[in-house]
């Protein structure tokens, strides 16, 4: 039965592409469409790095601080400079009481115990290999760089929050939309360069390319930079709560203007740079990106729209084969703890990232995660290139699904 659901979802997805995009899929499905490749080629490693570096001027961009608000303003100014008109979501945030059971999934059992069943990570996956403890650094003195430490000194306070998005309106189907997201906030007393400066910069670079004056799309694309991810996906959840019931409404009637087009898919980008493999037996990490590094594409098998989300994930995988220059992609079914989660029962949703979120990142495979070492200077061009390959993958997939092309 599940296979029938998946194939039905695939058929629905293909049907949604329109004749222009379907026609480009021949017997050799990995052959790129030259119109799409021309857009992908507008991505540039140095520009991607410059955007990440620009985000790090605001330290860890912790929500509820002046540095976070300044980062939102900076992101909005960049999006406007690309020609992508912006809007903001506004909501209130109050710190919830501490969770008395922060790890209900259990995690790994102690080495000396005999569990009744294999342990599972967040999202439902089974952790394997060498694991190290993870945590969120809250000690300012753990940051040895006085400049970065000073940037991050202001504590967070509860109250009003804002996040920014911009929109590329489609020409023939402005009433249908893909949402491309990343979270711009961080914590840990570093620069949040990877988590999630790398995803934020990726989304901004896609906004730059698609907002080119010579680029048009059939369908609408929204580029959203969520806030309050680190406190529980609050910014993305606020967007869903405020906007999901507005989908497809033409306002004013007869205008062909759709403030919230019908959602066709939501694609999140979170931590794009670091795939150095599992920790070594002594708990240290390899200094270089592993030769087998890949872009991870995850959907959640328990979501109400899991069949459609799986189809979307494989569309991203195919785009990676067509347009990514260096690193392949891998599809998994344990998407979790990321801003696509509030969307997953409303619209097909996937997450694009460096490692599997639950089984690998959650097992300590990225030692910079929420730590003072998440600095721009920590990463090298091999790391940044993994992020660029994720950008190539997403830009190629979005371009195909929205009928994007360069006007002649």
Q: What function would you assign to each model-found segment?
A:
Residues 8-17:
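Bacterial N-terminal signal peptides
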Residues 34-43, 56-69, 150-155, 185-197, ...:
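Second-shell loop/turn segments in exported
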Residues 40-47, 52, 56-63, 75-86, ...:
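Sec/Tat-exported extracytoplasmic proteins
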Residues 48-56, 86-88, 163-167, 177-181, ...:
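Structural recognition of the beta-strand scaffold that forms the well-ordered cores
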Residues 50, 54-167:
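A non-catalytic alpha/beta surface segment that caps or lines the substrate-entry region
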Residues 166, 180-234, 394:
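Alpha-helical metal-binding/catalytic segments enriched in His/Glu/Asp
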Residues 226-339, 345-349, 356:
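Metal-dependent peptidase/peptidase-like ectodomains
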Residues 358-408:
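His/Asp/Glu-rich mid-to-C-terminal helical/loop segments that flank catalytic regions of hydrolases
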